[in-house]
């Protein structure tokens, strides 16, 4: 069966003929609506149901005035016909009736059936009633019922008794807005059944016999209405004239009212430290070193509580220790020194994230709750404040201008109207005022206004020709009639404008109309595209004709074929417009359409020069907003952009805030449809027990994690066995995402599965908030699951939830409500959500959507928090201005410009006193450390800004402000790394990850946290000379120089061991590229971390077609050299591989979470994350389909591949050479690279240095004892020449300072010179360490005294054990043997202590033989590892078709080429399966 698109068969026929009898012929036999299956990837080619016939009949209560023939008119537009005086009617109007075909559909969209009205002849209104809405829990929505406002009741009591039939124009400020008087969807209010058929009359063609009396309106409302004349009245609606916006305002107000200012649980005004579930495996035996500061006490108290200690118990112990037993712990709280962050009393210490990361001494401050500042709390007077969205949105000033202009123009129009009625002269003044009114209303000129203006001009022209002297009709009477029609047309245009766009006014009395529809009518989607208004004059000259296309989409997929419509040239009336007036008939039953269907219309111009069709603008709209279809005429802003985002066509793109330069008018039918939920099919009693193979196949398919990675065939298989899927073998997003379409039956089954599903964890529901699931019921269930997360847990996923708002059907959705609720409960959530929304405002298509949500957030936050938001925003604005001025300055002037502009920040803090840091709301700043601010010489010229901490117990805070770089991608990568680190911590694995904060504060700008005591690997390489990147010992030597004590060195080695493994795993999974020594950082405590994530997901830079990043991740031989302590502890490399593989396998178990987080960001506009191929890249790196053994083998190969990748070293060498040539000696070190300014730490200071003795060798070494600031001591040896070299360096670096005199050799007598130098050098060191803080803490002084320690040096210290200890030196091999079905798998992991007969290291490989089978048939072999006594393999050996283990022996032989090294025979029947085990090797020479 094929669909037939029916339009006017002859558009050139006269206008009168288009109202004659029309017939739609059936293409084929009727088809049951229940058989309609609506898919996504096929063109609709079948029709369902019958298309009825039109018949004509006369209705005495309606009127038509036929208009002149029009060549391009094929349908009805807004108020198509003239409307005559309100008390004059004609009997020539036509009535359209439908033959009843079938009963009302029980599913989908039902026709709006209205009760019979009373006194329907008293008024006719365009308003829409608001029926009773029972919410999402009802089985269906109720039938729309008429609703009368106070204005309606007055209208019904009035009769026209005055001869003046003009409307009254006024502005009402005190009448509360009522939804029924400004509905945006024009729902019909009344019905009238007559003799077996139903009347259907276009609202633009019908007025009833009643209306209001202007005089009585004035007498009734004269106290509340600003009277302007005798025409029209406007009422103020602060919540907007649009019902959707007004409803959203009411919803936000109700949410806010649930959280009273007096509720200290949710309105403490404090920033609580974030917590997680207590990591038992990590902190089972951990104790924290805590210093407690108490008011009126100079010395802190020292406690060492266990990690599982409750905060309130610690407070009780502190109070008991202070002999204040009368004080209650509940009245006290602990704050973190240096910040405004407070611990949560009901949580364990170890649950707080700050304790999980900070392993040093933690300083806390005990405060009384009532004395702790709650400055961010909401005040009592805010509980009853009203939410008017237009008071917070940017375009509020546009509304005011529009309203004020409209009122002014109406006054002028009224003045000229009175003058015209009195004198019948100066009609052109009237026409000019009408043009101005249309201009204010988006430059929209309706047909009714055009016809009235033309007729008015014609009357006065004929009057001048004495045309009416012989006529019974007076010119004055005709003028009154036409001006009434003109006023009515203006009135209706104002009403349509107010319902189409956001406005804070609307007409007081909207004329109502009635429409009728047989509920059994199988109606198809149909509407009229009338015109595109206000065509730019440049288009008029460039294009000879204009056309449009339209289509329907659902979930980013087209539901039907795109149709092109006829080309029409523009015309000039008041403004340029293109008038198609073309009726569009979709061959789709409305009830078969998905509820979340979107209509998209494109405007094309036919170029005069090339005759090509160029896309000029587009718009989109939901077909069924608020569960009901759109009724009547609507205006739509057209977006002047290249292409609509097909995948993101959602209501969020539909911007109704204000008219755009080009406005599209669409006339929808007067009859509406209302959505009814499908009945769920609960019967599953006939299901058979699934086959075992079927369940296994479902589990294999579930490894795809997201429907986007499933092929159509696999989707069909999964959907076929959908009722066998559960949370043990599959995920709900995969099952629902495999549905073949969104027809009524499929939706019913999806909802059935949805209700029956048991979620394994709340985060599984994240996959239901992607763009693949627009269904509101599915998204509602997803939010219900996420509501089980705590505020601190939800905080981690806010970026994805903000993106998910794009695909919500309206701003009253459960997801938006969840975000607002949590922002009221947590300042942390509110603060992060604020900056995410501020950043999202820069997204082109969803700016208005996010603006409204941001306004709602600010209303909920309260005045105090909003004041902080304003200060933070102002701070960012000043930083942006400073950055721009520094960039625009020349190289030699930049430092001067920066110093001058920093003064603006000082003025800022003089005005605001304090301000919270956007990066971290718990940090409050009060000023600028002027001398510590600088800029960096990288391409973006970022600023280093050091703020003064407002907390007297805190240190200064340094941040980097970047302008010119898009930091959103950095935010995403760091968020995903934080998620992985949290997973590791919960599994008991602390990878010592440093994850710095990063915040995008606007388009291509943002803040980056500076990590103290960190330096780039490139700088370490530069200190090692020209070929530093090629040396093996560079990193080891650097750590040795900065960790002289054995304990410090071991700690640094352990930190590097774990952090290097962690960053290897995360950078591999995320495919982080552009890795070189300039974006790898090291701290002196051993932590390694990466920065700058502009390239990820494998999008490597290329040079000459060759990728610059050719290693899976950065793990170089110099890193291995440090881990193995120069090769002395080769088993450390095995431990490193084990750690990496363990961390990798832990993350693989959470593949679904990572892929869901990435999928939810697909449409965030990130350059590196834009398609399914990017998700597939991460999927391929995670390998969720692999076993742990397979994944271990895979990642080990990647480690070896990275270790052997020489281009990495070459790339580091190139960057080092480039940096050495770029850095000018005149520039300070802190300006060469952002992180290098953190090289010096105030904690690395020296108290004193004393020479203990000297040795009379050729070099005359002096033994020096160095006392550190923490009272620790170390020893170092220096020669007299080294002292002299130090003095020369200080003279060059501090030429402006007066340095102590150095005891040169010529100052000393020839006798007893050694003892004299002993004394003089001690005196010299004492002076140097006291000359100034700048000299004492300089690089050269610190490196002189803290390098080359002789006590417990790294070379002399005992080995550091990082993994499993092996006291013996016997050779052994580690295996993991598994057996499933008939498959035997052996993972060869490591070997230890293997040697050749001469004692040298072998290049060993392993051979396997499965006995008693012939050796050649069952022989397997691994690759060889060259020259290693402790080799690592992690290779898998597989034997298939092993029916049983009993009677089989595995022979393992280790060889170095052909030389025998060792062997063992393993009886498989006694082997512990799936466990790691070390097996001894026999016959090897030790």
From Swiss-Prot:
Reactions that this protein is recorded to catalyse: a 1,2-diacyl-sn-glycero-3-phospho-(1D-myo-inositol 4-phosphate) + ATP = a 1,2-diacyl-sn-glycero-3-phospho-(1D-myo-inositol-3,4-bisphosphate) + ADP + H(+); a 1,2-diacyl-sn-glycero-3-phospho-(1D-myo-inositol) + ATP = a 1,2-diacyl-sn-glycero-3-phospho-(1D-myo-inositol-3-phosphate) + ADP + H(+)
Family annotation (Pfam families): C2, PI3_PI4_kinase, PI3K_C2, PI3K_rbd, PI3Ka, PX
Coiled coil: none
BP-aspect Gene Ontology terms: cell migration; chemotaxis; modulation by host of viral process; phosphatidylinositol 3-kinase/protein kinase B signal transduction; phosphatidylinositol-3-phosphate biosynthetic process; phosphatidylinositol-mediated signaling
UniProt main location, coarse: membrane
Record domain PI3K/PI4K catalytic: where: 929-1207
UniProt-listed SUPFAM superfamilies: ARM repeat, C2 domain (Calcium/lipid-binding domain, CaLB), Protein kinase-like (PK-like), PX domain, Ubiquitin-like
SMART domains with a match to the protein in the record: C2 (SM00239), PI3K_C2 (SM00142), PI3Ka (SM00145), PI3Kc (SM00146), PX (SM00312)
Catalytic class of the enzyme: transferase
Residue span(s) of domain PX: 1240-1352
Positions of region (G-loop): 935-941
InterPro entries attached to this UniProt entry: ARM-type_fold, C2_dom, C2_domain_sf, Kinase-like_dom_sf, PI3/4_kinase_cat_dom, PI3/4_kinase_cat_sf, PI3/4_kinase_CS, PI3K-C2-gamma_dom
Domain C2 PI3K-type stretches: 521-669
Record region (Catalytic loop): 1071-1079
Subcellular location: Membrane
UniProt-listed Enzyme Commission number(s): 2.7.1.137, 2.7.1.154
Region (Activation loop): 1090-1116
Topology versus the membrane: Peripheral membrane protein
Residues in C2 domain copies: 1369-1486
PIK helical domain boundaries: 684-860
Reported function: Generates phosphatidylinositol 3-phosphate (PtdIns3P) and phosphatidylinositol 3,4-bisphosphate (PtdIns(3,4)P2) that act as second messengers. May play a role in SDF1A-stimulated chemotaxis.
Protein name: Phosphatidylinositol 3-kinase C2 domain-containing subunit gamma
Species whose genome carries this gene: Homo sapiens (Human)
Gene: PIK3C2G
């Amino acid at each position: 069966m094929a669909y037939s698109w029916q339009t006017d068969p002859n558009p050139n026929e006269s206008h009168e003929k288009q109202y004659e009898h029309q017939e739609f012929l059936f293409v084929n036999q009727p088809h049951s609506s229940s058989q309609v299956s609506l898919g996504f990837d096929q063109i609709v080619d079948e029709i369902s149901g019958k298309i009825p016939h039109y018949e004509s009949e006369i209705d005495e209560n309606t009127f038509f005035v036929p208009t002149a023939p029009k060549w391009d008119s094929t349908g009805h537009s807004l108020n198509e016909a003239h409307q005559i005086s309100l008390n004059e009617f004609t009997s020539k109007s036509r009535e359209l009736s439908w033959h009843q075909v079938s009963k009302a559909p029980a599913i989908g969209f039902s026709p709006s059936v209205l009760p019979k009205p009373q006194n329907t002849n008293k008024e006719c209104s365009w308003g829409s009633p608001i029926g009773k809405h029972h919410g999402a829990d009802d089985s269906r929505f109720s039938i729309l019922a008429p609703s009368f406002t106070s204005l309606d009741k007055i209208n019904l009591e009035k009769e026209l008794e005055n001869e003046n039939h003009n409307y009254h124009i006024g502005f009402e400020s005190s009448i509360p807005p009522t939804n029924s008087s400004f509905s945006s969807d024009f729902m019909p209010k009344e019905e009238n059944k007559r003799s077996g058929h139903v009347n259907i009359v276009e609202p633009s063609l019908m007025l009833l016999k009643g209306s209001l009396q202007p005089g009585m309106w004035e007498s009734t409302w004269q106290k509340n209405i600003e009277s302007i004349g005798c025409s029209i009245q406007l009422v103020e609606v602060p919540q907007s004239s649009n019902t959707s916006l007004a409803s959203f305002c009411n919803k936000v107000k109700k949410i806010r009212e649930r959280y009273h200012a007096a509720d200290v649980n949710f309105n403490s005004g404090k920033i609580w430290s974030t917590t997680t579930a207590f990591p038992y495996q990590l902190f089972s035996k951990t104790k924290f070193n805590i210093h407690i500061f108490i008011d009126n006490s100079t010395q802190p108290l020292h406690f060492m509580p266990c990690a599982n200690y409750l905060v309130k118990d610690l407070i009780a112990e502190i109070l008991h220790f202070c002999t204040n037993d009368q004080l209650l712990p509940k009245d006290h709280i602990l704050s973190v020194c240096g910040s405004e962050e407070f611990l949560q009393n009901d949580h364990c210490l170890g649950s707080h994230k700050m304790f999980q990361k900070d392993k040093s001494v933690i300083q806390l401050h005990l405060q009384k709750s009532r004395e702790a500042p709650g400055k961010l709390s909401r005040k009592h007077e805010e509980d009853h404040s009203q939410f008017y969205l237009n008071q917070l949105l940017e375009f509020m000033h546009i509304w005011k201008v529009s309203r004020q202009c409209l009122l002014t123009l109406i006054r002028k129009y009224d003045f000229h109207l009175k003058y015209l009625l009195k004198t019948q002269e100066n009609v052109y003044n009237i026409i000019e005022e009408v043009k101005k009114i249309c201009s204010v209303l988006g430059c929209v000129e309706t047909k009714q206004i055009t016809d009235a203006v033309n007729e008015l001009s014609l009357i006065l022209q004929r009057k001048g020709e004495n045309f009416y002297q012989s006529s019974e009709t007076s010119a004055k009477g005709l003028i009154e009639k036409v001006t009434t029609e003109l006023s009515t047309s203006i009135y209706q245009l104002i009403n349509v404008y107010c319902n189409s766009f956001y406005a804070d006014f609307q007409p007081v009395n909207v004329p109502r109309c009635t429409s009728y529809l047989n509920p059994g009518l199988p109606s198809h989607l149909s509407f009229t595209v009338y015109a595109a208004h206000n065509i730019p004059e440049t288009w008029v000259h460039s294009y000879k004709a204009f056309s449009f296309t339209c289509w329907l989409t659902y979930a980013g997929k087209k539901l039907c074929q795109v149709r092109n419509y006829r080309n029409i040239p523009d015309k000039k009336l008041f403004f340029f417009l293109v008038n198609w007036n073309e009726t569009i008939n979709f061959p789709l039953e409305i009830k078969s359409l998905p509820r979340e269907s979107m209509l998209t219309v494109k405007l094309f111009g036919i170029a005069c020069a090339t005759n090509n069709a160029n896309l000029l603008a587009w718009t989109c709209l939901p077909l069924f907003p608020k569960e009901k279809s759109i009724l009547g005429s609507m205006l739509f802003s057209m977006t002047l952009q290249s292409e609509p985002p097909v995948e993101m066509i959602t209501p969020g793109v539909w911007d109704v805030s204000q008219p755009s330069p080009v406005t599209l008018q669409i006339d929808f039918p007067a009859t509406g449809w209302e959505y009814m939920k499908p009945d769920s099919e609960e019967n599953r009693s006939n299901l058979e027990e699934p086959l075992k193979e079927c369940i296994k196949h479902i589990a294999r398919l579930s490894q795809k994690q997201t429907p986007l990675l499933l092929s159509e065939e696999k989707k069909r298989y999964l959907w076929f066995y959908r009722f066998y899927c559960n949370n043990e073998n599959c995920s709900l997003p995969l099952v629902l995402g495999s549905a073949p379409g969104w027809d009524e039956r499929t939706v019913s089954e999806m909802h059935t599965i949805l209700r029956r599903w048991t979620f394994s964890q709340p985060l599984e529901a994240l996959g239901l908030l992607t763009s693949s699931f627009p269904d509101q019921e599915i998204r509602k269930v997803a939010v219900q699951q996420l509501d089980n997360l705590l505020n601190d847990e939800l905080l981690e996923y806010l970026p994805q939830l903000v993106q998910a708002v794009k695909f919500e059907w309206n701003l009253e959705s459960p997801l938006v409500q969840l975000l607002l609720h949590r922002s009221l409960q947590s300042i942390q959530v509110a603060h992060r959500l604020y900056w995410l929304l501020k950043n999202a405002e820069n997204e082109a298509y969803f700016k208005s959507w996010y603006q409204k949500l941001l306004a709602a957030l600010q209303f909920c936050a309260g005045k105090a928090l909003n004041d902080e938001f304003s200060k933070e925003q102002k701070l960012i604005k000043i930083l942006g201005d400073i950055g721009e001025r520094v960039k625009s300055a020349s190289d030699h002037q930049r430092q001067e410009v920066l110093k001058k502009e920093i003064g603006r920040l000082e003025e800022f803090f003089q005005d605001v006193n304090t301000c919270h840091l956007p990066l971290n709301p718990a940090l409050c700043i009060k000023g600028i450390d002027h001398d510590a601010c600088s800029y960096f010489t990288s391409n973006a010229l970022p600023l280093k800004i050091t703020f003064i901490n407002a907390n007297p117990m805190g240190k200064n805070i340094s941040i980097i402000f970047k302008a010119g770089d898009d930091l959103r991608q950095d935010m995403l990568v760091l968020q995903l790394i934080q998620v992985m680190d949290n997973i590791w911590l919960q599994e008991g694995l602390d990878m010592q990850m440093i994850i710095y904060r990063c915040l995008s504060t606007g388009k291509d700008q943002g803040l980056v946290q500076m990590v103290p005591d960190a330096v780039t690997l490139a700088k370490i390489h530069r200190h090692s000379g020209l070929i530093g990147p090629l040396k093996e010992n560079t990193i080891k030597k650097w750590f040795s120089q900065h960790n002289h004590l054995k304990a410090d060195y071991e700690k640094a080695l352990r930190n590097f061991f774990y952090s290097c493994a962690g960053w290897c795993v995360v950078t591999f999974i995320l495919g982080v590229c552009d890795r070189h020594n300039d974006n790898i950082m090291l701290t002196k405590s051993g932590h390694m971390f990466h920065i700058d994530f502009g390239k990820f997901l494998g999008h490597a830079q290329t040079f000459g077609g060759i990728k610059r990043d050719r290693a899976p991740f950065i793990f170089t031989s110099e890193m291995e050299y440090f881990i193995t302590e120069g090769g002395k502890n080769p088993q450390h490399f095995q431990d490193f591989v084990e750690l990496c593989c363990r961390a990798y396998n832990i993350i693989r178990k959470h593949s679904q979470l990572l892929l869901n987080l990435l999928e939810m960001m697909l449409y965030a506009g990130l350059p590196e994350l834009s398609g399914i191929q990017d998700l597939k890249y991460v999927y391929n790196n995670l390998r969720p389909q692999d076993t742990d053994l397979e994944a271990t083998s895979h990642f080990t190969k990647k480690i070896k591949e990275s270790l052997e990748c020489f281009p990495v070293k070459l790339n580091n060498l190139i960057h080092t050479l480039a940096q050495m040539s770029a850095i000018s000696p005149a520039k300070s070190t802190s300006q060469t690279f952002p992180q290098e300014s953190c090289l010096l730490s105030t904690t690395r200071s020296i108290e004193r240095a004393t020479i203990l003795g000297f040795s009379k060798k050729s070099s005359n070494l002096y033994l020096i004892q160095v006392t550190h600031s923490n009272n620790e001591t170390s020893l170092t040896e220096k020669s007299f020449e080294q002292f002299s070299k130090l003095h020369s360096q200080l003279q060059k670096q501090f030429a402006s300072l007066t340095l102590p005199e150095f005891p040169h050799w010529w100052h000393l007598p020839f006798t007893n010179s050694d003892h004299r130098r002993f004394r003089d050098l001690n005196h010299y060191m004492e002076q140097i360490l006291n000359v100034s803080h700048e000299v004492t803490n300089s690089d050269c002084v610190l490196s002189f005294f803290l390098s080359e320690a002789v006590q417990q040096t790294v070379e002399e210290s005992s080995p550091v054990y990082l993994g499993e200890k092996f006291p013996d030196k016997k050779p052994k091999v580690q295996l993991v043997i598994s057996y499933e079905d008939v498959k035997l798998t052996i993972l060869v992991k490591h070997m230890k202590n293997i040697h050749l007969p001469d004692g040298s290291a072998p290049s060993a490989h392993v051979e396997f033989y499965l006995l008693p089978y012939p050796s050649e048939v069952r022989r397997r072999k691994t690759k060889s590892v060259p020259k290693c006594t402790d080799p690592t393999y992690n290779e898998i050996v597989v034997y298939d078709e092993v029916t049983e283990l009993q009677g089989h022996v595995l022979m393992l032989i280790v060889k170095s080429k052909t030389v025998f090294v060792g062997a063992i025979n393993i009886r498989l029947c006694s082997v512990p399966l799936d466990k790691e085990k070390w097996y001894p090797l026999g016959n090897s020479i030790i």
